[in-house]
Regions:
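Compositionally biased terminal segments of proteins
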Residues: 1-170
Length: 170
């Protein structure tokens, strides 16, 4: 099957899932894209350098959520210089994995500092992905220096479709 056919097939499966679950297509598509980015992160040389946190961690725990999330929250155990983060995310975008129809656009990566208050500074990464010509905005917020208690453990993130699931730190 060609890359175009795989993308179209995956897109149709996501559309079917959204209809079956009564959820908006864009929401399910966004979750799929975030899941496949996490899968690439798990397969990358940086897999042990990031810890999943936030709303997607609640998804992994299958906890109820009040609203859908549109971004990935990570705790970074890497150099927090913007150029370095851009290189790391770009490397993850290009990790070779089993065909899943998603393409992450390394050239679209933009990084910026985020300041929630005087004691916290993180990095926001924005880029986009495509699936069968559908453009998917991606956002990752990376915090640094947070204490995680108890320490992080490996989890298997739930897969929307019958594709290999990400195994990552959380």
């Amino acid at each position: 099957m060609s890359a175009r056919d795989i993308g179209a097939s995956i897109r149709q499966r996501i559309l079917n899932k959204s209809r079956n679950q009564g959820r908006p297509f864009q929401e399910v598509l966004q979750y799929f894209a975030m899941e496949r980015f996490l899968y690439r992160l798990a397969k990358s040389p940086y897999s042990d350098r990031f810890v999943l946190k936030g709303a997607l961690l609640l998804t992994a725990w299958r906890a109820p959520q009040s609203r859908p999330t549109m971004d990935i929250d990570l705790e970074g155990r890497v150099n927090n210089k913007l150029d370095h983060i851009k290189e790391v995310v770009g490397t993850v975008c290009e990790v070779d994995v089993e065909p899943d129809g998603i393409a992450f656009n390394r050239a679209s990566i933009e990084v910026s500092r985020i300041k929630e208050d005087a004691d916290y500074e993180g990095v926001r990464v924005q880029f986009h992905a495509t699936l069968a010509r559908a453009r998917i905005p991606m956002q990752i917020d990376i915090g640094f220096g947070d204490v995680i208690t108890p320490g992080p453990t490996d989890i298997e993130y739930p897969s929307l479709l019958d594709l290999p699931a990400p195994v990552l730190r959380a």
